[in-house]
Amino acid sequence: MSNLQSIRLARERIVREHMEAENALEMHRALGTFAHPRYEIMATGHVYDGPEEVNRYYRESRAAFPDQRNELISLRHADDAVIVEFWLRGTQKSPLGRLDPKGREFQCRMAAFFIFEGADLVCERVYFDSATIRRQLTGAS
């Protein structure tokens, strides 16, 4: 196995572990996949940097969507990243910003760039269409 193949395999294992930990609501395990925890949510402009902020993101997102889960669609490698397409699904059970909960489910196709420095995961940068989720949660057409 080449060095590049070894690096890609190790990175892929980290990303899969991270996504599985989120689905199992084992946020300490998901946090542990980072060398330095950082989330960048591009649709909202929010950045959560460091363990305390990333834990806050986990608490807030899972309070609104306690059954939030991801389903991997595809995974690709770049020089410094693993790029993942996935379905994110959940049911809103508590307020999300100004959106009151109506018990509605959402499903949104998303992309995440898991950014690496060498073998270390240092950032998850997530891209999605927030209007898709808002429409499903509010029932607007």
Task: Name each model-derived stretch.
Residues M1-S141:
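C-terminal and inter-domain tail/linker signature
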